[in-house]
Amino acid sequence: MPRNVELEHNSAVPEHVHAITLVRHGRTAYNAQHRLQGQIDIPLDEVGQWQVRQTADALRELYVDRRPDIPNRLVICSDLGRAAATAHAFADPLGLEVHPDIRVRERSFGDWEGIPVEELAQRYPEDYRSWA
């Protein structure tokens, strides 16, 4: 379920910004296997596809059905497929354009990407402890 973060009135925030909602992508096979995926472009699995449909319904209800007076809605996502699929599940039925942006991409974990977290803890115990 998306977390709604309402912005307090702040001179640094433009008047027209009503809310910013951050939504994590749906589950992937790597998530289910507890593998560190980082910037490897792993697609959503069946559970992840179901999750994004449910999240899209909740977002539509929260931000469109209950607040039809807000004219501008902007959907920004990572350029990775799992994030784009999540964004499109909400945006496409509403005719909203999705703006992929590499600046919101998952961070890189370098050589750790694709390795199960449990294996990382065993192979690199000191590094893993400082990271986790």
Regions found by a protein language model. Give the residues of each.
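Short, positively charged
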Residues: 20-25, 111
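Residue-level recognition of specific faces of alpha-helices
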Residues: 19-22, 32, 130
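Active-site-proximal alpha-helix that buttresses catalytic centers in soluble enzyme cores
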Residues: 2-5, 24, 29-94, 123
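General small-molecule cofactor/ligand-binding pocket signal
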Residues: 21, 76, 99-101
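Non-catalytic terminal regions with compositionally biased, polar/charged low complexity
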Residues: 2-16
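Phosphate-handling substructures
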Residues: 93-132
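Extreme N-terminal starter segment of soluble prokaryotic enzymes
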Residues: 14-21, 73-74
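Structural motif
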Residues: 12-15, 67, 99
